[in-house]
Amino acid sequence: RNADTITNVGSMSSPDYEKILNLNPTTLLVFSPGSGSSATTAQKAANLPGVDVVYLGLYNPNVTNPADSRFLQGILKAGYIFNKVDRATEYANWILNITSEINAKASTIPENQLKTVWLTNSPTLGSTRAYVELDTLGQACVLAGGKNLFQAPLDSTAFSINPDTETILSQDPDYIFLHTVRYTYGGGTNEPAQGIDCNDPTEMDLVLQEFLATPAYANLAAVQNKHVYLIAGDFRNNAMGGTLGAVYMARILYPDVFTDLNPQSIHQEYITK
């Protein structure tokens, strides 16, 4: 639909309940259960009589063990809600099969042959980060057989940390993945242009070159060996729950192990089906 025909009902944390009710919905899917200044699911339900307010938990994947994730349970619940149980089950099984296929091969790689990885953000996204195992990217890295060089302190709930340059240099990663975000929560855009609506790789190349031009990183193994990759924000934030990101990572990190893994084919199957 044309964006001009879609009603703006306010922010996800404090929506305009009157506008929502005027649309006569039967169901409202919420992004998070809410806390603090963000209205909870129960509060939204109290303000929307006659509307089923549902939190599916799709932003909580467990890429290494999706069967135990709120993400996969959310897919199955959505199947019941929208009377698409067979389709939801097929999708859930598809994700489980991909995970099993990758894990079966990654688990055979000896510890001393694991590729070391730094999962960071592109230069356009502010201060330098390292995404840890709690984050979707960190989980995708583990499934793909990568050894994430950065971890959060014990009992931390952080998805990333901010390592200093000295620490990064001392870790000297074999591979670096730069997380990029095109569309923001506020509806804005970041460079580089990417995704289905992008046919020109110029901005992607400029962002990559900006990172590679960082003097402090010039002698890192990943930079020297041209093992620095942009990874689209969709592989962290979209409805694949990080699994597709793991597919690409596995093929990049271990092309000789995952010889029959075709990321483009799997990606196309996801889009088509």
Predicted feature locations:
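Extracellular/periplasmic catalytic domains that process cell-envelope and extracellular macromolecules
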Residues: 2, 21-22, 46-48, 108-113, ...
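Short, solvent-exposed loop/turn elements at domain surfaces
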Residues: 1, 30, 125-130, 238-240
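Active-site/pore-lining binding-face segments in mid-to-C-terminal subdomains
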Residues: 172-247, 251-252
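His/Asp/Glu-enriched short active-site or ligand-binding loop at hydrolase and phosphoryl-transfer sites
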Residues: 134-158
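Structural recognition of the beta-strand scaffold that forms the well-ordered cores
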Residues: 27-31, 52-57, 115-120, 139, ...
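Acidic/His-rich segments in extracytoplasmic proteins that coordinate ligands and/or metal ions
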Residues: 1-81, 159-209
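Catalytic-loop motifs flanking and including active-site residues across diverse enzymes
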Residues: 133, 137, 242-245
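Extracytoplasmic substrate-binding proteins
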Residues: 41-126, 160, 223, 227-273
